[in-house]
Amino acid sequence: TPQPVQPAPTPQGPLEPQPVQPPPAVPAPGQPLVPQQQQTGVPDPNATLAGKGTDTSDVAEVTLSPKPVLVLSGQTSWDQGFQKLSDSFKALRAEAQRAGLAVAGRPLTLFVETTDEGFRFDAMLPVAIPPGGQAPTVGADFRMSTSPAGAALRFLHQAPYDDIDSTYETITAYLEAKNIVVKDAFLEEYVSDLADPGDPNLEINVYVQPK
């Protein structure tokens, strides 16, 4: 049986004017400006950049909003790539905890450069910036930045990480068929944790951005 709607509580006295929030403070010189967290309340550590896909055969046109991210750059061989990324995310989470930053989304990897031997990457962890928008102080190996933003195509990988090459072959074929030219750097978002490269239920969003 539907419950009756409760009336809004009656104020016990005259409403007090709310203080005006000061503008965000400017970060110290050399620190990149990071967008202030738009959401209120507790940050969601499982939030994705543009929702979740449900079918690996679907290609979604999405718009990525910039998020403050804690970044750890690195490079690795293809054979060691999965373990290197997994270790990078553990390091990012530990640094976020040390710096008092709440995790505000699923981890990301921006593949900056790829070769036959391996790749250079920026591992990213979305975080909530404390009120005031000041750039937090982080360790020497880390930096604050923003996640890629703008129009993108989202492809869904639901299979072991060992099989991700097949997803990229599908992406390449789709882009060629549609005559879409994209930026060289592509972005992976790990809806599932990178624990086992053979996990058949691993879920990854792959974003490519048209030029």
Model-flagged regions — what are they?
Residues 1-211:
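A solvent-exposed interaction/effector surface
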